[in-house]
Amino acid sequence: MKKLLIAFLIFLNFAALAEVMPYYINSLKRNGIGFTSVQSPLVMRRMPSDDGEILETLNFDYAANASCLINKQRCSLDEIFAAYSESKKIALLTTLDVSENWSMVCFNQIDRPICGWVDEKLGNKYYNWSDFFNIYGRKYGLYMFKDLQKADKVLYAGHMKQTNTTGSIELPKRITPWLVQGNWVLVKVNDFNNQLKTGWLNYRDDRGKLKVFVKFD
């Protein structure tokens, strides 16, 4: 019985590691211009060119396993990905810059993160904020980070805080984005009491930190 319990706990831990989502404002260690959906094996280069020096090659298999070939070490998923969903087969890295068909991406590490250019012709795809919320957000919905203040949950009539408020988000069943303007997203909210609300939500602060994310899990 004890062995079965230990095996069950290991299984739960293994399964949990296969889903990495940010739930707090500081869960994402890098502020970027969007996200890049990446494919394995992922080759990261110093320059946006096929001739650029290879900085790292990342392998992952959507089963809680990821390894770096250059450093020859197994990596923690939450130290690499901004979001990683085994069930949706989605792996996202923070994007810092773009150049034609290349994206500069960065691992989600605090100290000495690995950053490099990845080729979009190899199946990787960059999403700016508008595309990220309009494509993924409309499909899966959004969720708010757990450590938001009440002021962060207020809905406005326009995409600025100087406009009138239209309500606030309490316990949402679903948040659906419709339009992105700067750091604001127009959302339709189905709240806990089935009350429908519409308004502009400030999804990113002036420092570039996100307050909401796509509900992949």
Per-segment meaning from a language model:
Residues 19-146, 188-217:
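Boundary regions of SH3-family modules and the immediately adjacent low-complexity/disordered segments
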Residues 137-186, 190-196, 201:
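Intrinsically disordered, low-complexity segments enriched in Gly and acidic/Ser/Thr residues
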Residues 13-16, 178:
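Long, low-complexity, intrinsically disordered N-terminal extensions of eukaryotic proteins, enriched
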Residues 4-14:
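Sec-dependent N-terminal signal peptides
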